[in-house]
Every structure is written in structure tokens, then in C-alpha cells.
Regions:
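A cross-family detector of function-defining hotspots
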Residues: 1-128
Length: 128
């Protein structure tokens, strides 16, 4: 799983990730002009995508995480990779509402330990 996240990070159109302490995820903001490149990169680690309409049929652990961050609203999407053991990679696509900026947060669902979060931070060079 961390290998696919590494491939994703290398393909991501923006450099630089920060640590989002609210959600214990790495975050990157980008301009809407980069949407095609961002979507291509997401496919490397996150083959499943859920919008507000399809969120109800997402697996339970995906719905639980989505609800823990306030739900999935219009224009937002949630991405998931395949489960590896006790972990599932997750992406949250959140437009800012200014029509030009989107944030992507990448995190882990499942039975996540401190060492898993630390490894995520290190892999994305988002040490906080």
C-alpha cells in the first residue's frame, strides 16, 4: 500500500504536502487547471471514487471515515485504495468554493496506529 502511495506522490502534479492536524492526513492544494493530471495520479493508488450520490453504497469503513470528516458534500469526492491488511488508503477531494482551488487530503482508514501516521508523514515529507 505504501508503495502505491509513493507512486501516487511522485505522479502528483504539485510538489509539497503539509500535515493536516484536524484529520491526521497529508494535504495538497492545487489549481483547477491541474484536475486532469490530479485525476490521473489518483488512479495509481485510489481506484474507487465516491461522490455524494454514490457515497451511500460505499463500504462501511469508507462511510464511517467520510462521516467523521463531516460527510461528503456537493462537488466533494472521496477516493479509496484497496485494503492492505488493516489499512485502507483514502483521499478527500475538497473544492474551496472559489472555483479555482481544490485541496486533496490523503490518509488512512482502518486500524491506524501512530507508526502508520508517522510513515504517511514521512512518505509525503509532511512532517509536522
Amino acid at each position: 500500500m505504501f508503495f502505491s502511495l509513493e507512486q501516487f506522490r511522485k505522479a502528483w502534479p504539485k510538489q509539497g504536502w503539509s500535515w493536516d492536524y484536524r484529520f491526521s492526513m497529508v494535504a495538497s492544494s492545487f489549481h483547477v487547471d491541474l484536475i486532469p493530471d490530479a485525476e490521473r495520479a489518483l488512479l495509481l493508488a485510489f481506484p474507487e471514487s465516491y461522490d455524494p450520490k454514490g457515497f451511500a453504497r460505499a463500504p462501511e469503513h469508507i462511510r464511517e471515515l467520510g462521516e467523521s470528516v463531516g460527510g461528503i458534500r456537493a462537488d466533494q469526492r472521496m477516493f479509496a485504495g484497496p485494503a492492505v491488511g488493516r489499512l485502507v488508503p483514502i483521499g478527500l477531494w475538497w473544492p474551496w468554493g472559489d472555483e479555482i482551488t481544490i485541496s486533496l487530503r490523503v490518509g488512512l482508514a482502518g486500524y491506524v496506529g501512530e507508526h502508520d501516521l508517522r510513515r504517511l508523514q514521512m512518505n509525503f515529507n509532511a512532517l509536522g
